[in-house]
């Protein structure tokens, strides 16, 4: 909470992250439609609309929708190919879906009065756990027990290998935690700072500085939204590469 004496200014930067039901004021259950549900659905709808508009009636001179769709497709495809190799191309649809959902959800959260779904650890944790479970299953299906060689650093001195194995196992199971907190933390922090500057814009004495600050931070948040989608996706590719080629 922040208050300004004598101006009646009161603003709560963290209120924008409150999950509330779409209908009524009752308690939120796992089946309750909420603002999170709404904005995730809007993100999915926006992605579907973009891809349908971008792939229907493709022309030699592409439309804006086609250009954006092809740019996103080519960008993620090259990322998957460069990081995971040819073996990882078959998992491109899953990784592309992750990238587009996070990117569009981040951008929708920049609309005034909207809700940033990726600022909630509950959302990012599900995405990170899905990645963790998927790459682990792929690792065992493709390599069998050989997947466990990911934790055994054969190039290290023999005396250090057991210690390094413990460290590798711990770091492996910490992956979904860091994967989810990184995205949620960055999105929440940026939006909270933006809200603070927007609140101070109501104070005449500092309004010009606050407005300039809002504009600068908003531009930075656009960049952060894209970067965080990229970071989440490229880490997914790195984890997938470990599953496909676990040998150190």
UniProtKB/Swiss-Prot annotation:
GO MF annotations, alphabetized:
proton-transporting ATP synthase activity, rotational mechanism
- InterPro entries, A to Z: ATP_synth_F0_asu (IPR000568), ATP_synth_F0_asu_AS (IPR023011), ATP_synth_F0_asu_bact/mt (IPR045083), F0_ATP_A_sf (IPR035908)
Localization of this protein: Cell inner membrane
What is any Pfam family matched here?
ATP-synt_A
Where is it chiefly localized?
Answer: membrane
Positions of transmembrane segments:
34-54, 91-111, 121-141, 147-167, 197-217, 220-240
Tell me the SUPFAM superfamilies matching this sequence.
F1F0 ATP synthase subunit A
A Gene Ontology cellular-component term: plasma membrane
What UniProt keywords apply to this chain's record, in alphabetical order? ATP synthesis, Cell inner membrane, Cell membrane, CF(0), Hydrogen ion transport, Ion transport, Membrane, Transmembrane, Transmembrane helix, Transport
Q: How does it sit in the membrane?
A: Multi-pass membrane protein
Under the subunit heading, UniProt states:
F-type ATPases have 2 components, CF(1) - the catalytic core - and CF(0) - the membrane proton channel. CF(1) has five subunits: alpha(3), beta(3), gamma(1), delta(1), epsilon(1). CF(0) has four main subunits: a, b, b' and c.
**Described function:** Key component of the proton channel; it plays a direct role in the translocation of protons across the membrane.
Q: Which family would the database say this protein is a member of?
A: Belongs to the ATPase A chain family.
Name of this chain's protein: ATP synthase subunit a
